[in-house]
Amino acid sequence: MNDYRPLTTEEIEQLQQNGCWAEDWTSVNVAEDFNPEHMRQVMLYGEVCIGSFDKSIEVSPGFHKHSGIRNATLHNVIIGDDCLIENIGGFINNYTIGDECYLSNVSTIETTEGATYGEANVISVLNEAGDGNIISFSELSSQLAALMLKHSHNKEFRETLFQLVREYVSSRLPERGLIGNNVKIANTKEIINCIINDYCEVNGAERLSDCTLLGDATSSVYIGTGVIAENTIIDHGASITNGANLQDCFVGEACQINNSFTASASVFFANSVMSNGEACAAFCGPFSASHHKSSLIIGSQVSFYNAGSATNFSNHAYKMGPIHWGILERGTKTASGSYLFLPAHIGAYSVCLGKTMAHPDTTSFPFSYIIGEGEKTILIPGRNLVTVGLYRDINKWPKRDLRPAEHRKSIINQEWLSPFVISKATEGRRILQELCTTCGNQCQEYHYQGLTIPRSSLLSGIRFYDMLISLYLGQVIKKATLPAAAEEEGQEYTPLSEQAIHNGEEAWTDLGGLLLPQALESQLVEGIIDGTTEDIESVINALSEAHSHYADFNQAYAFSLIRQLYEEATPAAFSLIETRADEAKSLWTEAIRKDAQKEYDLGDVDEDTFLHFANSISPAT
């Protein structure tokens, strides 16, 4: 911003000749090289500072207009250099505007008393009728929000963490609204109590109230026609367009929300895409997608998720209100017309079909089909492992991360073969084996915690989980530096630390895309409660630090599993693991080809498409 000086008598006279008026000309200050020729029909109230008008502004591709202020009313405003402000139907009140901005055909831009800009807004996610469990602020990430959500029942933790966020926000909250450099705002009705960062664009919006738009030259925010957003923070690279309506939301990096999608008290992170439908009290982690008008995501936590058309959840059980919620672990899909009666907890990379009423908990059965069929909930364990859909998903997500390297607050570990999933599959295999042993081999159906498992599905489920474990262990052995291999290649072998081994061998968790040992999460929670973690930056750094050691923790878990299955982690065991992994890869890729062949045989896919996919399947995936 400039150093501003008072207007000269000559400048005041020229401004008056141009149809300008000031409540008090002595309260108007300008840049040293200010040119009054470029101000016409401007009403000035309160303290106003105006920059220079040397450049032209590109208002549309190839169409430039000289900077200046025309047909506007300003009150307590600071304006940087080379801005074009024209046709302000109402007024601009209590705002600071940066350099080279274009503001045209806007009704009102104003900061009022008590403005929060969407910062430190507490919302209730999952339990629609519950106390607020996520506090929104500009540095919110998927894993930090997941941590808040997971431990919201711990009052001491919640209050302490919320206070750390409030301290962070209060130290940075401006006294009035800010519009950064190179911002475009056009054809928009109301912007009230908003911070709009550099290079953001708002075109045709209905109303933005108490919002923060985060952006810079590498990754800006775009707000389009008909959008209404209230008490919402919109992160770098996101776009909200075509009549979307947001209230009490956080929209993360590179998210797209459009086509009249409506959301309240919901958070969306990293590359999520929401169109046409509705979300309420929803946690949508990285790569969540819903494209259909008839789909409702309510009271649910999802990530790497795809909602089929007419997907619906119910968070009312009877008459106690919308207090129930569910978790669909990473990679889950809901098929067209599916209905899930909450509470429910669905295992990773599963597919829900039909109307599921039995409140299933399938966390120990990843990669499954969960089928609602009348009063029954049928479980087909592990079936999704050998489908075209899974293969396409695990290969497409890495290619669809649209965030620039500078703006990746949400940590996304895209490993589909991870301790988090493998530990669940190992437990699932044990349960299936016990059911087979306990109930005998002659049963046509097995029953487990309200789930019905057909005999053939139980037996194939055991095989699928054996395949999965072999794939995982083979992958880890391939990547790990083993003592014998290091010696043979003349490399220095650095063993895992005792701490890495201890943490990696224990239970694992998924915090909104961050895979880490449960022990590290517990340590972080304890540190927040006892005050050893003193500020929100330390919390964020601790999560990043946990991610940086994933490879060591992963290897520690894998070696622990090897000792369980092979007694010792010896060269002979490693050789056997590699052999079994190669066999599993061949079986897995062949099963996926057969799954694709089914669709081709039905005549639903042309030959070229089928052959292109079949030839693209890599056994090394």
Kindly give the residue locations of the regions a language model identified:
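Glycine-rich hexapeptide-repeat left-handed beta-helix
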Residues: 6, 10, 14-22, 30-53, ...
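Conserved short histidine dyad/triad with adjacent acidic residue
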Residues: 25
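Phosphate-/polyanion-interacting regions in eukaryotic proteins
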Residues: 68-70, 74-80, 84-159, 186, ...
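A charged, amphipathic alpha-helical module
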Residues: 165-179, 185
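Core alpha-helical transmembrane segments of integral membrane proteins
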Residues: 179, 183-202, 210-221, 226
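Long, compositionally biased intrinsically disordered regions
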Residues: 373-621
